[in-house]
């Protein structure tokens, strides 16, 4: 029985996005015996798509989003509609590596109580050039009291952890809340802080399982750094970091607003 759902949020399928979508589907098809695919997006993008035209290998479900189509809201809607024991988040311009499932099976045996398992993420630029790796620090000698485990205490000091590509127990996330779409920049950081604060066990997999395109032009985090409409200054970036450290005590989002002094 397939017990993992891959949630793929989509806001556009024109031009280069269609090429990204095709690569993302091929990435998931490697694991067609183990996973199902859940697409989330607006009706004008996904409304005319036929399941059998997407993949002849995967079990595909489509959820039409009639509300906010921002990344957090799309993922949250996918989680609400997830019925498997586990889920993972795949960004449209990213890919899983061939050992993604195998390494999960191996390290879930090592960490049987884990509610979340995060693979090492290979960060590349839009040309595919290696930039760095993420999520690997927890295996450094002496970094964590329990090697391989990511605690709330560690997260309060270290913020750079990637949530896409990881494995999440659906029941635990539904119980503790998903992404808060009103938090800019640090929404995934607040998410991990909240989960670990509430007792969720997070372990990391010391193998590369996910390839992430970092700061692709027009991506959300690119816009925070470069867009005239969404660019964040140093003061606002610091504000959202501190906000994450205050808001993780609360399951539901509260009103938060940055005021430029």
Predicted regions and their residues:
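Short aromatic/hydrophobic "clamp" motif used to bind/position activated sugar donors
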Residues: 87
């Amino acid at each position: 029985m397939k017990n993992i759902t891959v949630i793929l949020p989509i806001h556009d399928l024109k031009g280069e996005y269609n090429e990204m979508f095709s690569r993302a589907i091929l990435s998931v098809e490697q694991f067609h015996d183990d996973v199902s695919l859940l697409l989330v997006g607006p009706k004008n993008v996904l409304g005319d798509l036929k399941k059998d035209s997407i993949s002849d290998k995967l079990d595909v479900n489509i959820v039409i989003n009639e509300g906010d189509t921002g990344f957090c809201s799309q993922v949250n809607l996918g989680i609400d509609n997830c019925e498997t024991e586990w889920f993972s988040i795949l960004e449209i311009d990213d890919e899983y590596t061939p050992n993604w499932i195998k390494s999960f099976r191996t390290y879930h045996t090592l960490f049987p109580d884990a509610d979340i398992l995060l693979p090492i993420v290979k960060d590349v630029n839009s040309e595919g050039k290696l930039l760095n790796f993420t999520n690997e620090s927890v295996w450094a000698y002496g970094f964590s009291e329990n090697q391989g485990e990511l605690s709330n205490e560690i997260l309060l000091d270290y913020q750079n952890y990637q949530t896409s590509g990881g494995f999440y127990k659906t029941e635990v996330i539904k119980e503790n809340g998903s992404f808060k779409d009103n938090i800019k920049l640090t929404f995934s950081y607040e998410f991990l802080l909240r989960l670990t604060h509430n007792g969720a066990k997070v372990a990391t997999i010391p193998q590369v399982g996910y390839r992430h395109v970092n700061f692709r032009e027009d991506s959300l985090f690119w816009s925070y750094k470069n867009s005239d409409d969404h660019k964040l200054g140093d003061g606002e970036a610091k504000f959202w970091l501190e906000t994450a450290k205050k808001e993780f005590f609360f399951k539901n989002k509260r009103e938060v607003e940055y005021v430029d002094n």
